[in-house]
Amino acid sequence: GALSGGGEEYKIRKKLIENDLVEAILVLPMKMFYTTDISVTLWILNANKKERTFEQNGKTKIHRDRTNEILFMDLRKLGVAFEKKFIQFDTETIEKISSTYHTWQSDKEAYEDIAEYCKSATLSEVIAKDYSLVPSKYIEFVNRDENIDFDTKMTALQSEFVELLKEEEKSKQELLTVFK
């Protein structure tokens, strides 16, 4: 796809990154749109990532200098069921996403990378990954199996399996007795 593909897509993506136009990449959950059930990616492009102060809705906003940075957000685990087969963001989720993005834009000290959710990557990190914009290459994912003692777990599963086989054999014998 456009996030990591080769050929013309690679050339376009590389130019966008080299020209520091990519501000953020947000991966949405699957089944958010009626026309496709695949995960859609939002590219937020910004030609002015320099520090600046501006007015918005009657409030003064300050954006920090985000030159050579890209925010990656993986939103695939967020959202609530809608019309049985679709996913949508509720107000709380929208506020969480918006808060993360705006905090990243304005206050580097308050923003923090969160495993399985968001990561602020530098241009050098993106170049090191050959200009890939696939969020999973940057966002840390937690290996939940890491803390499992394999030998203990395997012994427990084997014991459970032996018990199930014994129960199966007992049930077979009971069935044979009934049908005699």
How should each PLM-predicted stretch be described?
Residues 1-180:
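A conserved structural/catalytic subdomain of Rossmann-like adenosyl-cofactor enzymes
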